[in-house]
Amino acid sequence: MQDRNISGILIIDKPQNVTSHDMVGLCRKLYGTRKVGHAGTLDPMATGVLVMLIGRAAKASDFLLEKVKTYETTLRFGIATDTQDITGEVVASSGTVPTKEELEAVLPSFRGDIFQIPPMYSALKRNGQKLYDLARQGIEIDREARPVTVHELELTDFRSNADSTEADLTVTCSKGTYIRTLCHDIGERLGCHGTMAALRRIKAGMFTLENAVTPDRLKEMNEAERDALLLPIEDAFADLPAVRLVPFFAKLAHSGLEIYQKKIGTRLPEGTMIRFYDENGFFALGEVRPYEEGSAIKPIKQF
């Protein structure tokens, strides 16, 4: 079967107990193209925003992976598991649980630039082997702490009864942040253990649940309805400044050549990421870079 010539961004509201790769397979089948990727995996137990990249949009993956993401999570106190979430085996338990005030007192120390030790049950690799493959063999290795940024961490609910004590948190964080590790570390800081009981991604970059469609709804649609859901590739970069080029300079940019700012009348700071437009619309991402003859904008990814 020949791939359809179709491109765009699809926001799926991923349900529980399916993998991100399952969603890639579904989109390949429904959109009739093998060119499908995503902009950041969700574990099977997690739900919410999964940014699917169809056709030429798959080229945007590396850039979208860097975007800030927002999650809603439930932290259950009193137990620790080998996976740091509720799907794992309990490896420690505690008869004590924190009060709401005690939890609120430690949260500020988990905001901003922090370090996390990645969990063994993760897709990170050591000597070509994924850590979760080693973990399933009962092997644990030392992992270096990695810097991540927690931009926002807010307590939205706290409840305690005879069965459990749980807290609902909203977290906005950088690439590479493990929410289950955050839950685990908060529990350890409070001296009572903690594990992630639920996780829902509500925002990834510019995309929210308002843009999302469920897999079941997607299956019910006809081809035209599904195609109409696809967002333009440029929507992923709506927060970047746009530079519109006349045909002469657009031809240079299409060839990957730098264009000096003094020649097109722009004064963007070095390091600025930009969107390139020609008479047909968005066609590339670029960056402002220094050159001997002055500052220039350089195409770095053509779409």
Where are these regions (language model features)?
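Accessory RNA 3′-end/elbow-binding domains used by RNA modification enzymes
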Residues: 1-15, 21-38, 42, 46, ...
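RNA pseudouridine synthases
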Residues: 1-211, 285-286
